[in-house]
Amino acid sequence: MKDEVNTALELIEGGKADDTTAIIAELASRGQWEVVYLLSVTAGRELSVLFDAENTVHVDWGGPGLVPLHPPLGISIPFRLWVHTHPHGYAYWSQTDRQSIAQGTMILEQAQVLGGNGILSTTRLEHPSSLGRLADSGPLARWTKEQVLPWEEWQLRKQSNSCEAITEVSV
């Protein structure tokens, strides 16, 4: 993993975005969100990772403070997961994030934002709920309101899940 990070950092510094997006897509496919976030911080730009219905990964670079949900042509819906970064701050749902999630309610299943404090997730509910939602009414009433999962806790869960998978395979 260290080699992948160093290679990605060299590509970012060299301005070779196409090569960088391929590396980020691979890291995202492996669930290595901490590395994806560090690359975004190093580049000083937000980035967006979108998993489509066929589990194809699409990566899009934004600016220092904005990367809206912007699916490329030919992508398969529904979108399984949209992950984007806030490289200069915390994981929270900005107004742009909320607008993107609201607009994607019918075609997006889950969204996450990566920030310095951890990972914030939301999952679309089949029906609006009165418990823990992003808004009281409208499209955001169909999205769960969750707490930020600190990076340390995320790492522990990831390690725990890896150990469980190894145990299941070896039994």
Regions found by a protein language model. Give the residues of each.
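Conserved beta-strand-loop surface patch within small alpha/beta domains used
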Residues: 1-81, 88-171
